[in-house]
């Protein structure tokens, strides 16, 4: 991401760091123009910037992580595919007359291994987001996804899914076309597949829209991704009749990778580059690729029956809670 883009999409909590980095660049430029050696001062300022970056990103609130997950320049499914896949051939259509641009997928080669990759796809600007329906798939998108996954299962190719959606499309037409049935069918079928399945939340994992491609042997999240039953804004509006309490809802919902790892819902937190994935997309992709390759190798050592049994047990263990604790979280 260029400096101008970063400044355009600067988040409030990033401003102190941006101002310090801009000051460093200004001093460096003036020193070069006047042939003055300020290397010692620059080193001190860069050390301060590094410490400030560490301080900011080690103490992010759930709401701030949500801002990072929704960042307009955060790498998307297609961005990651283009960076990690040795070969990639996109497949289209649900064979029912619909090709949903909000959910993309195809055949790829990862680390020398043929795989099927699919995921939600948001847009880069307003026009692109409208075309992609802001990453909210219609029923045809989930039917396209299951078609590709059945293809993968038939030809013994592992399945990799990238989750990045505020939720499935909730329009009247989506309900008429069977949104609930399409997602439910995917859930059932994904439990039955023989091949390894790895699901990764790369940005925003929202509600049933995320679950529709979220059943796997491994569920992973990027460090600053979020995964939630409902957006904090929607949760606040429902519980407190006030969307402005979204920050409070974000805490209660336990949406961060750290929270979900502690709750046993996800298996792995994938670290992001300093400053988050949008600052250095290539490094983020390299870390993601290494993690996927290693986990695929591990899962390939299991038999299909072992994988399906562990997959079933993994999801059966999700959802145990104490009512008193949940009430405390809602009223705190």
UniProtKB/Swiss-Prot annotation:
The keyword Nucleus belongs to this UniProt entry's keyword annotation: no
Superkingdom field: Bacteria
Catalytic activities: N(6)-carboxybiotinyl-L-lysyl-[protein] + acetyl-CoA = N(6)-biotinyl-L-lysyl-[protein] + malonyl-CoA
GO terms of biological process kind: fatty acid biosynthetic process; malonyl-CoA biosynthetic process
InterPro entries with a match to the protein in the record: Acetyl_CoA_COase_a_su, ClpP/crotonase-like_dom_sf, COA_CT_C
A Pfam family reported for this protein in Swiss-Prot or TrEMBL: ACCA
PROSITE patterns: COA_CT_CTER
SUPFAM superfamilies reported in the protein's UniProt record: ClpP/crotonase (SSF52096)
Localization of this protein: Cytoplasm
UniProt pathway: Lipid metabolism; malonyl-CoA biosynthesis; malonyl-CoA from acetyl-CoA: step 1/1
Family label: Belongs to the AccA family.
Protein name: Acetyl-coenzyme A carboxylase carboxyl transferase subunit alpha
Organism classification: Bacteria, Bacillati, Cyanobacteriota, Cyanophyceae, Oscillatoriophycideae
Gene, per the UniProt record: accA
